Amino acid sequence: MKKILFPTDFSEVATNAFVHALHLADVVDGELVLLHTFQLPIVDSQFTPDNYYMIYESLQLAEFDAFKDEIPKLRAIAEKEGLADVKITHRLMDGDLVTTIQNAIKEENINFVVMGT
């Protein structure tokens, strides 16, 4: 089974690319690996507030909640396209876009990447 990485920021352009990724997955009998990346701010250790780790964790949680809220919307698009049977897995990764895409490609043994720009 072929694996297709679909990096997304959940924009309109990305949603359009998602439809194409679904159809490609259908044609090649593949599965989609949906990837959303985010980058947390870097703070100078000399000026790190005592509650920095709590702030960091709350930012991660906010990203996760936003990611989780978008998944049903993408599932609805798959159903509308008649492609609800395409397997979709989800990844949320912290880091810069290029590095996280490269890591996901290696970790997931990705065959194709489909993304909107």
What are these regions (language model features)?
Residues F6, L34, L92-M93, V114:
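A structural signal for the hydrophobic beta-strands that form the central parallel beta-sheet
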Residues A62-E81:
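N-terminal Rossmann-like dinucleotide/flavin-binding domain of flavoprotein oxidoreductases
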Residues T117:
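Short secondary-structure boundary segments
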Residues K2-M54:
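Small/aliphatic-rich secondary-structure junction motif
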Residues R75-V113:
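Structural beta-alpha unit
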Residues Y52-A66:
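A short acidic, glycine-rich active-site loop
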